[in-house]
């Protein structure tokens, strides 16, 4: 391969010029044309920028550059999600303070991000671990507290004995801590929660209006998990106690033969008889070690123990044995379920294992297989006065009867729980609450924010919050009574920091408020948000919740933070498996960029993969892109020579010009439309076709229309520019055009140029292509029929046969159907 002039030196040259000329500075005066483009901000880990960062930021930047050329005032900020467990664990291992390691990593990553040539406007940077940011994270906590949306309660939490901290459900993978792989246990702790369940219905409803991937919307729908049913009361035999079960199938109530409580349910200790106490205690210990995900697994064999107590069936008065089982969660519904083994697979499995009675109360309609367990709707049997009703009718009528007796009510239930936001760790934003023996819970007054995270802290994990041991931090005067009090020793989950960061970027220097209300309502919502699908049920849900809360508190006038969402796929190792150091298949962007320049790397990421899917890395693929860039460079040199010594020229648009013009406008149209859908691989394929057409015109047309030719070359460099920014800027300069290609208007396609005078159609006989013909694009159906029938190559297939019909697909084909 010939040496290219394009290299890393060209990258550095243009990055310096862009920086000096402030090419990408956002102009607040043009807010009416704003387009807010945002990628999920990175965690500042110690390693260099990896391929995942590149795949997120490079292609999105290309889209943003195109939008800028289309006349949008693009707001494209960047920052760092800088609190969190990794820096603290690193500190425990190395003794380097989390603040120091985090800030050093940020400086490294800033430099690397600049070297990517991405159009971030660094004036708007935010870093979540700095007091000027977390002051406002604490302010948001206080606003939720004032609104009754932040509260404390005792809760069984996932506890990692090794990390010595609470884990969210999502951080427990197969019963183990996702960070260190230790088996997770359960622990009762008083924790802070945000009441996200208060917004469950709106979070569900508004999903329909969002331009988000359907799969992500479905994940949120399932996570919120709305079910409409009823709560039915069961009294406990021989005691003045009762409990409620939530069910969506009240029509099966007559089939209940036992009830199950969650092992953690508060009634368990009150109702267990002496004979069964030991077994119940043992089982409770066993259940503690299971994660919720394991407990709900359909593969897992169902287990449980009898408490010795009985409940009274609310309709029949029968005694039903009360069991405890780990497949019932105290945090879902009421923590109690009725066992209807005839009509529920899980209950059937449980009843069969423990020899509990199984009753049929629903039969199928028509010839369906209604062998037990029969879980579909049907007709009620063995159900007293409700026998003969349909399931749909009975599930309402049965509840109405019980409601009249004060034993039931209709109820909507959600699977989603409130968001646990407190962490027993050091490296996070302190919770702005004071505990006073006299006054109870006292919020820190706004004027005293931020509650600063002290630097000199022992953060070795002991199971208690590290801040608890820091007397200077903990001891404080109560703002209400002036007496001695203690600060809350916990810190906020890092997902709280990232649940509002998109609101801070446009007003990141504001020290009076988190953001100016008037300004933020002009700048938001985010128009295009790009990041990993793994955040579907955490960050993306939390951000929607916080936006809605701030709207209801009067700070925002929009409902949703991110109008349009794109997920990038994953680039795998060359062996097709996920990249990991242990597999030795990690691709380091730096090595390739040194060799080829960042634009070749960027182009390969966009051309070699479907953006939302990703796929395995290929060295051959990046070499092919390097050859393509080289080919473009050679073409530009050739064109410059031709322009200097054109020989004989013309002004007419003849067939060769019309053909090149067609490819030009076809390319502009499809690059514009495909890039807008983040289908970069097909957009770049169209650009490659235009390069072929330019070479053809250069090499085969003796007398050229130089004015037209130059226009096409200009358009070509403009549409290549977002995808290969440094290289295109260099070519633009070499062509002698004024700086910068990114200040040019994005080309528009002309539909007229896409209408060809002559087009090629296929001629088929009985659906098989037998010939092709050049025909006028405006030919009538009758003319097309005659052209097809008189085609020499087709005639032999028609000899002696009866023509039944002729099918014409305009501009595509003629199909002659014969006997």
Curated annotation (Swiss-Prot):
Q: Which residues form a coiled coil?
A: none
For this chain, one GO molecular function annotation is:
aminoacyl-tRNA deacylase activity
Is Protein biosynthesis a UniProt keyword of this protein? yes
Q: Which domain of life is it from?
A: Bacteria
From which source organism is this entry? Answer: Caldanaerobacter subterraneus subsp. tengcongensis (strain DSM 15242 / JCM 11007 / NBRC 100824 / MB4) (Thermoanaerobacter tengcongensis)
Name under which the protein is recorded: Leucine--tRNA ligase
Question: Which is an annotated Pfam family here?
Answer: tRNA-synt_1_2
Q: Which reaction does it catalyse?
A: tRNA(Leu) + L-leucine + ATP = L-leucyl-tRNA(Leu) + AMP + diphosphate
A GO biological process held by the record:
leucyl-tRNA aminoacylation
Q: Record's family?
A: Belongs to the class-I aminoacyl-tRNA synthetase family.
The main place the protein resides is: cytoplasm
Q: Which GO terms describe its cellular component?
A: cytosol
Q: Where is this motif: 'HIGH' region?
A: 42-53
Keyword tags = Aminoacyl-tRNA synthetase, ATP-binding, Cytoplasm, Ligase, Nucleotide-binding, Protein biosynthesis
EC top class, in one word?
ligase
Where in this protein would one find the motif 'KMSKS' region, according to its record?
578-582
Q: Give the source lineage, highest ranks first.
A: Bacteria, Bacillati, Bacillota, Clostridia, Thermoanaerobacterales
Q: InterPro entries, from UniProt?
A: aa-tRNA-synth_Ia, Leu-tRNA-ligase, Leu_tRNA-synth_edit, M/V/L/I-tRNA-synth_anticd-bd, Methionyl/Leucyl_tRNA_Synth, Rossmann-like_a/b/a_fold, tRNAsynth_Ia_anticodon-bd, Val/Leu/Ile-tRNA-synth_edit
Where is it localised? Cytoplasm
Where is ATP annotated to bind?
581
The catalytic activity of this protein is classed by the Enzyme Commission as 6.1.1.4
């Amino acid at each position: 391969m010939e040496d290219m002039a394009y290299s890393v030196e060209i990258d550095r040259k243009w990055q310096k010029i862009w920086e000096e000329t402030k090419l990408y500075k956002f102009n607040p005066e043009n807010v009416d044309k704003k387009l807010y483009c945002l990628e999920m901000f990175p965690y500042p880990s110690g390693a260099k920028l990896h391929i995942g960062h590149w795949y997120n930021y490079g292609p999105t930047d290309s889209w943003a550059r195109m939008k800028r050329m289309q006349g949008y005032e693009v707001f494209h900020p960047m920052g760092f999600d800088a609190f969190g467990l990794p820096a603290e664990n690193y500190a425990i291992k190395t003794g380097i303070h989390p603040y120091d390691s985090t800030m050093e990593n940020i400086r490294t990553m800033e430099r690397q991000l600049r070297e990517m040539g991405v159009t971030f406007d660094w004036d708007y940077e935010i870093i979540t671990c700095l007091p000027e940011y977390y002051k406002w994270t604490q302010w948001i906590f206080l606003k939720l507290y004032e609104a009754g949306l932040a509260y404390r309660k005792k809760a069984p939490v996932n506890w990692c004995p090794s990390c010595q901290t609470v884990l969210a459900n999502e951080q427990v993978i197969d019963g183990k801590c996702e960070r260190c792989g230790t088996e997770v246990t359960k622990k009762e702790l008083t924790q802070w929660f945000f009441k996200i369940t208060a917004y469950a219905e709106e979070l569900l409803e508004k999903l329909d209006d969002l331009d988000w991937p359907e799969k992500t919307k479905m994940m949120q729908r399932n996570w919120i998990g709305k079910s409409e049913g009823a709560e039915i009361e069961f009294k406990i035999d021989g005691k003045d106690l009762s409990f409620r079960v939530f069910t969506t199938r009240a029509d099966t109530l007559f089939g209940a033969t036992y009830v199950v409580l969650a092992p953690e349910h508060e009634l368990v200790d009150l109702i267990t008889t002496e004979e069964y106490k030991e077994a119940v205690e043992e089982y409770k210990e066993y259940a503690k070690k299971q994660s919720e995900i394991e407990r709900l697994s359909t593969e897992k064999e169902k287990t449980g123990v009898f408490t010795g107590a009985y409940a009274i069936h609310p309709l029949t008065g029968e005694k039903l044995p009360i069991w405890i089982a780990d497949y019932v969660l105290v945090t879902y519904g009421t923590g109690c379920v009725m066992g209807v083994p005839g009509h529920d697979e899980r209950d059937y499995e449980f009843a069969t294992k423990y020899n509990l009675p199984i009753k049929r109360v629903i039969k199928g309609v028509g010839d369906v297989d209604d062998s037990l367990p029969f879980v579909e709707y049907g007709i009620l049997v063995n159900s007293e006065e409700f026998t003969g009703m349909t399931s749909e009718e009975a599930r309402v009528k049965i509840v109405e009867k019980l409601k009249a007796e004060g034993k039931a009510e209709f109820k909507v239930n959600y699977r989603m729980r409130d968001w646990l936001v407190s962490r027993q760790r050091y490296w996070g934003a302190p919770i702005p609450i004071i505990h006073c023996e006299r006054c109870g819970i006292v919020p820190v007054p706004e004027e005293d924010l931020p509650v600063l995270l002290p630097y000199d802290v022992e953060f070795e994990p002991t199971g208690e919050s590290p801040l608890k041991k820091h007397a200077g931090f903990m001891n404080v005067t109560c703002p209400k009574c002036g007496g001695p009090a203690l600060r809350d020793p916990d810190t906020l989950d890092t997902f709280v920091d990232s649940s509002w960061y998109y609101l801070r970027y446009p007003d990141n220097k504001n020290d009076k408020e988190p953001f100016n209300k008037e300004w933020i309502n002009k700048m938001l919502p985010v128009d295009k948000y790009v990041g990993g699908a793994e955040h579907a049920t955490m960050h993306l849900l939390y951000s929607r919740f916080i936006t809605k809360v701030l709207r209801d508190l009067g700070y925002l006038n929009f409902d949703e933070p991110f109008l349009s969402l794109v997920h990038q796929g994953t680039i795998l190792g060359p062996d097709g498996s996920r990249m990991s150091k242990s597999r030795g298949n990690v691709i380091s962007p730096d090595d390739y960029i040194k060799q080829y320049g960042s634009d070749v790397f960027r182009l390969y990421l966009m051309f070699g993969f479907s953006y939302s899917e990703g796929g395995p890395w290929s060295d051959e693929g990046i070499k092919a892109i390097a050859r393509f860039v080289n080919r473009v460079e050679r073409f530009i040199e050739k064109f410059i020579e031709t322009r200097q010594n054109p020989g004989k020229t013309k002004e007419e648009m003849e067939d060769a010009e019309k053909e090149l013009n067609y490819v030009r406008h076809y390319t502009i149209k499809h690059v514009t439309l495909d890039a807008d859908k983040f289908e970069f691989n097909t957009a770049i394929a169209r650009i490659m076709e235009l390069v072929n057409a330019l070479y053809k015109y250069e090499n085969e047309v003796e007398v050229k229309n130089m004015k037209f030719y130059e226009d096409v070359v200009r358009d070509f460099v403009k549409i290549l520019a977002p995808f290969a920014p440094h290289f295109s800027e260099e070519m633009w300069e070499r062509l002698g055009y004024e700086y910068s290609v990114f200040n040019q208007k994005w080309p528009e396609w002309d539909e007229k140029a896409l209408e060809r005078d002559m087009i090629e159609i296929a001629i088929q006989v009985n659906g098989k292509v037998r010939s092709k013909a050049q025909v006028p694009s405006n030919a009538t159906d009758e003319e097309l029929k005659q052209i097809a029938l008189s085609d020499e190559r087709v005639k032999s297939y028609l000899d002696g046969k009866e023509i039944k019909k002729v099918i014409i697909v305009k501009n595509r084909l003629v199909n002659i159907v014969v006997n």
